[in-house]
Amino acid sequence: MRRALDSAAQAGLCVLLVGIALIAATPLRLPALGPETAVAPPGTRAMWLWEQDEPRPVVEWAAANGVRALFAYYDPQAGPAELRRLATLKGLCDDAGITLDALGGDPSWTTAHATALTWAASAAATGLFHGLHVDVEPYLLPSWPNDKAALVPPYLALLQEMSDATELPVEADVPFWLPTVTLAGGQNLADAVLARVAGVTVMSYRNTATGANSIVGVADDLLRRAGAAAKPARLGAETQALGDCSYCSFHGTSEERLHTTLSAVDAAAQRYPAFAGIAVHQYESWVALSS
């Protein structure tokens, strides 16, 4: 989920988020939970940071709210002032025990691999980042509904190329419905993505903890598949407004409601070996819940 979607993209995303809720009612053949990965303790959080916010308040907020990983937007065209800001952010994160990952991505990267690889190389060359956090979302391309079969192979190739391009681990944002897509030959798209990245953040954007159409409920299949692949999977929680999808975000609720719900997610997700905590999207709208 990029910083703020334009109205057309937001409308398209809402259709995906709302329509795919019907998937929860469809029986699926799921992989076993698997014992291969370590479960994050309750309260483990991550956070997206898309804007060029002042570093100290960001890190103070993050540390106070259990954030152990920060995904900070990186522009490969960043000038000296922005690089100094990121260096300050890195130093403060190090002091607070928070890992700093470079955040970037665009649906166009699905086929514009040179742009994506230039970004990855530039981010790695700064020496500021622990990993690369990529948010590509090819399903937001206008051609996705009709050309999905043509777009999936370059998307998977991109993830592999990025993973091979640097020594930094690559973590990908993925929609919770990814396992519903089957590739030519019968492979599941979620399994194919997990095979190419170090970990995933599931955009499980719901504002209830458990049940058929909840954060844990919609992410169950991906959590199981991540466990079988021995890859960590964070669950995502949205605090920005998402069009007409009132149950997809905590926007308009409260910090207390968010905290209570995410604590319940922590408890319910302990049964999944792949569970790596909860990532909150994003800093500014999360802070706004407390005002």
Predicted segments, located by residue:
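Active-site groove signature of glycoside hydrolases
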Residues: 71-76, 119-152, 276-280
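Short, acidic/polar
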Residues: 49-64, 111-125, 181-193, 215, ...
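Aromatic- and acid-rich polysaccharide-binding/catalytic face
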Residues: 72, 130, 136-140, 186-215
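Substrate-binding cleft of secreted/luminal carbohydrate-active enzymes
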Residues: 231-291
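Aromatic-lined carbohydrate-recognition surfaces of secreted/lumenal glycan-active proteins
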Residues: 50, 99-112, 155-185, 230-241, ...
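Boundary/entry segment of secreted carbohydrate-active catalytic domains
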Residues: 27-76, 172-176, 278-286
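N-terminal Sec-pathway targeting helices
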Residues: 1-17
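Aromatic-lined substrate-binding rim segments of carbohydrate-active enzymes
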Residues: 72-105, 146-172
